[in-house]
Amino acid sequence: MTKFSSFSLFFLIVGAYMTHVCFNMEIIGGKEVSPHSRPFMASIQYGGHHVCGGVLIDPQWVLTAAHCQYRFTKGQSPTVVLGAHSLSKNEASKQTLEIKKFIPFSRVTSDPQSNDIMLVKLQTAAKLNKHVKMLHIRSKTSLRSGTKCKVTGWGATDPDSLRPSDTLREVTVTVLSRKLCNSQSYYNGDPFITKDMVCAGDAKGQKDSCKGDSGGPLICKGVFHAIVSGGHECGVATKPGIYTLLTKKYQTWIKSNLVPPHTN
């Protein structure tokens, strides 16, 4: 895993830069989904432990958050688990695949908070079936304030707990304007929510993404619009979840890596 070790120092630096921000998201205030009803979901793991979420966008590619990589240390062999509902049960639908390489967005080094997106290439292609399916990126417009969206993940249901949920859960959040998110009473520019980011949460702070589900999808009206990135604390109304918006520049970058899809 030479590719993995070559990034270890960089992501330790990025990790230190992001320590004041909760960048390992989970689901707060949601409910368990029907088993295998979200067949595009991926669990990125090491040693059998869930680290981050992800989305299968091609049989050999998973989309996730770039900061997830710094959680691995030299010598570890991370894997991707597809077709799961329960993390602990021995489900016949599960496929555990080795990771060939991580490809963070090219400008993540210069601006890690606003370019928190990464491709994960699998060693072998996933076998698509009713439990393992791709989620295509079709987002063409920005998200308007007030839009209702769903976030899915295996994160903890209690913001004070570090234990992930054993089963896949989902919560509905509301998109907030960048002006509000960057205001003094919200994030006050730390981090600054750019046009490549969006924040979403709940007016009462009871619904949020928080620890353990970074890289999972934000789906609005059936369209895959963004991935979970971070946020201060968990379930706090004035510190809503932060998401990397799948803007044109990211979609172009993704396509450039996937086409031709299996020759790298």
From Swiss-Prot:
Q: Which UniProt keywords apply?
A: Disulfide bond, Hydrolase, Protease, Secreted, Serine protease, Signal, Zymogen
Active site, per annotation: 67 (charge relay system), 116 (charge relay system), 214 (charge relay system)
Q: Which CDD domains match?
A: Tryp_SPc
SMART domains in the record: Tryp_SPc
Q: What subcellular compartments does it reside in?
A: Secreted; Cytoplasmic granule
Q: Which residues form the propeptide?
A: 25-26
- InterPro entries listed in its UniProt record: Peptidase_S1_PA, Peptidase_S1_PA_chymotrypsin, Peptidase_S1A, Trypsin_dom, TRYPSIN_HIS, TRYPSIN_SER
Q: Which residues form the Peptidase S1 domain?
A: 27-259
Instruction: Describe tissue expression.
Output: Expressed in lung, spleen, thymus and peripheral blood leukocytes.
Q: What is its main location?
A: secreted
Which family does the record assign?
A: Belongs to the peptidase S1 family. Granzyme subfamily.
What this protein is called in its record is: Granzyme K
Q: Which gene encodes it?
A: GZMK
